[in-house]
């Protein structure tokens, strides 16, 4: 069932795509986006619009200005040079960067800067969650299996629509209020992760091996954005089966709708 916010026309949600080495039309670099993101935004009452594959700062700033909120999505690994000076070769071999020479990394760093400068609602998912941490000087685990002793298997690509492990939520956090839960089952399709949030953020969900499954702005900084929720798991792949994950998109779209009214 389509969820319709109470606030007039649907808010415009800027969605950051992945990049593929060979697209279906001319087999060159192409923007790529799972339809699950668009479906989840539409079902929550938003209107998704894919961000252009450019690093032009002025163009990206204008995209953020026209949007009522931004969704940062999953995809290939972030360039480790952005958060770590050196890694052993055996770890670097596991890193699969975007095929565009780092342009997606550059583009999303600009988008994040503009989101905070223009104070737009933000929902960050998987890679987007990691990029948000990197943008503020945080570090990542480049390969969980090699760097986190006793870690769970977080790379369950065979079960993207299933709840494969649990995350403990911080009582009173935005995520716990949205999902009305203290423990949340999540899917898990990643091999990199945040283990320590950057300075503006606080972890609000962790798996039992310490991996940060969600982070939000620190309470004293919560006013910096109208809405910020950053999650490692993929709620867009869970919305059809579980109402609490639909609520994540509904709350995000509601925040975007309020932002739309405020700027009109």
Task: Describe each region flagged by the PLM.
Residues 185-191, 215:
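Short catalytic/ligand-gating loop segments at beta-alpha or beta-beta junctions
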Residues 126, 190, 234:
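Active-site glycine-centered loops adjacent to acidic/histidine catalytic or metal-binding residues
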Residues 130, 183, 225-227:
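A generic hydrophobic-helix recognition signal that picks specific residues
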Residues 127-129, 136:
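Active-site loop->helix "elbow" adjoining a glycine-rich segment at hydrolase catalytic centers
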Residues 183-184, 203:
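Short secondary-structure junctions
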Residues 1-121, 134-136, 141, 145-178, ...:
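N-terminal beta1-alpha1 cap of cysteine-dependent amidohydrolase-like domains
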Residues 229-233:
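Active-site-proximal beta-strand elements of phosphoester/diester hydrolases
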């Amino acid at each position: 069932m389509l969820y319709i916010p109470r606030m007039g026309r649907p808010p415009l949600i800027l969605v950051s795509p992945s990049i593929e080495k060979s697209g279906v039309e001319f087999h060159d670099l192409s923007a790529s986006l799972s339809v699950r993101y668009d479906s989840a935004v539409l079902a929550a009452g938003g209107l998704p619009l894919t961000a252009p594959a450019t690093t032009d700062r002025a163009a990206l700033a204008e995209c953020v200005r026209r949007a009522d909120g931004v969704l940062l999505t999953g995809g290939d690994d972030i360039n480790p040079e952005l958060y770590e000076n050196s890694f052993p070769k055996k770890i670097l071999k596991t890193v699969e960067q975007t095929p565009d020479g780092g342009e997606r990394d550059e583009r999303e760093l600009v988008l994040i800067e503009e989101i905070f400068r223009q104070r737009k609602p933000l929902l960050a998912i998987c890679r987007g969650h990691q990029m948000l941490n990197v943008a503020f000087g945080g570090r990542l685990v480049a390969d969980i299996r090699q760097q986190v002793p006793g870690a769970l298997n977080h790379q369950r690509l065979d079960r993207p629509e299933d709840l494969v492990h649990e995350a403990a939520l911080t009582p009173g956090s935005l995520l716990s209020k949205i999902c009305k839960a203290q423990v949340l089952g999540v899917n898990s399709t990643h091999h990199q992760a945040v283990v320590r949030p950057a300075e503006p953020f606080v972890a609000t969900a962790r798996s039992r091996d310490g991996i940060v499954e969600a982070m939000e702005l620190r309470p004293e900084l919560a006013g910096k954005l109208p809405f910020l929720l950053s999650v490692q798991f993929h709620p867009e792949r869970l919305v059809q089966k579980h109402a609490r994950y639909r609520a994540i998109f509904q709350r995000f779209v509601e925040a975007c709708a309020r932002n739309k009214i405020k700027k009109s």
